[in-house]
């Protein structure tokens, strides 16, 4: 499936999204940004994303630091395409 996963710099490095992903799309990588963990989520295997959005649900930040954008084949099958 052709989903894209976007990680924003509001990520606090808590690893909740990584642990929630059933297909191991996400991993933590070193980051020199403004979080105490010194790590940020990354999505090196987006081709394995099934679009379940468990990562979004698991994210504890008010900013929703991770977003899954469903591919056109999924939105079409769900009746969400224009």
Curated annotation (Swiss-Prot):
Keywords: 4Fe-4S, Electron transport, Iron, Iron-sulfur, Membrane, Metal-binding, Oxidoreductase, Photosynthesis, Photosystem I, Repeat, Thylakoid, Transport. Pfam families: Fer4_7. Residues 2-31, 40-69 form the 4Fe-4S ferredoxin-type domain. It is a peripheral membrane protein. It catalyses: reduced [plastocyanin] + hnu + oxidized [2Fe-2S]-[ferredoxin] = oxidized [plastocyanin] + reduced [2Fe-2S]-[ferredoxin]. One of its GO terms (cellular component) is photosystem I. Its EC number is 1.97.1.12. [4Fe-4S] cluster 2 binds at residues 21, 49, 52, 55. The keyword Oxidoreductase applies. Binds 2 [4Fe-4S] clusters. Cluster 2 is most probably the spectroscopically characterized electron acceptor FA and cluster 1 is most probably FB. GO terms for molecular function: 4 iron, 4 sulfur cluster binding; electron transfer activity; metal ion binding; oxidoreductase activity. The keyword Transit peptide does not apply. Its cofactor is [4Fe-4S] cluster. Disulfide bonds: none annotated. It is found in: Cellular thylakoid membrane. [4Fe-4S] cluster 1 binds at residues 11, 14, 17, 59. The cyanobacterial PSI reaction center is composed of one copy each of PsaA,B,C,D,E,F,I,J,K,L,M and X, and forms trimeric complexes. This is Photosystem I iron-sulfur center. It comes from Synechococcus sp. (strain JA-2-3B'a(2-13)). The lineage of its organism: Bacteria, Bacillati, Cyanobacteriota, Cyanophyceae, Synechococcales. The gene is psaC.
């Amino acid at each position: 499936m052709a989903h894209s996963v976007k990680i924003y710099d509001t990520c606090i490095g808590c690893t909740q999204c990584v642990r929630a992903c059933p297909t191991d799309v996400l991993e933590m990588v070193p980051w020199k940004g403004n979080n105490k963990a010194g790590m940020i989520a990354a999505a090196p295997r987006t081709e394995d994303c099934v679009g379940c959005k468990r990562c979004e649900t698991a994210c504890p930040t008010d900013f929703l630091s991770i977003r899954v954008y469903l591919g056109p084949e999924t939105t079409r099958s769900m009746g969400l395409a224009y």
